[in-house]
């Protein structure tokens, strides 16, 4: 009987610890997303890469991603994103060794263009409208800048099971086929 009581107490303590971790998660996610976006805005690529889900780099190296970021900047496109609010955090989806959350948030996105990119502003406008909707995308001609004031965005937060060491991936419809190469379809379906 004493063993049974000890097991019950241990299980109770463990469940309380899990609840305590879950209550801190929204603030962790908000802070992490703000940090990630700030690093992107300031072109701190090492910080961005360190915050990304490691399995992403089975598709291409960290150096290739750094070069892609730099190339976009060199071509004349500067994207800044300001977190407005975290709107929704999905219930956790567990696998045998990882946990996943989908985080929906709102942000102000600005896409400033110059050089080669400025020559293709109509194509960029169509691409942004296909992502955010026609009415959301505004163009500030004097600044050569597209503005999406209240963009709906999503990110995946992934950590080892029973850990708060979260890593992140931007989530958008254009990348779904890529995501399926590193995250199971079952997990993605549960997160939608």
Give the residues covered by each predicted segment.
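Short acidic-aromatic low-complexity motifs
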Residues: 34-49
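Short solvent-exposed beta->alpha transition segments
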Residues: 30, 46-100, 113
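Generic surface-pattern signal
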Residues: 38-42, 70-78, 133, 188, ...
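Exposed beta-sheet edge and beta->alpha loop/turn motif
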Residues: 93-192
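Generic anion/oxyanion-binding catalytic loop in active/binding sites
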Residues: 9, 37, 54
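Generic detector of short, locally flexible boundary/turn motifs and exposed helical patches
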Residues: 22, 30-31, 64-71, 120-124, ...
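Short, low-complexity N-terminal intrinsically disordered segments enriched in polar/charged residues
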Residues: 18-38
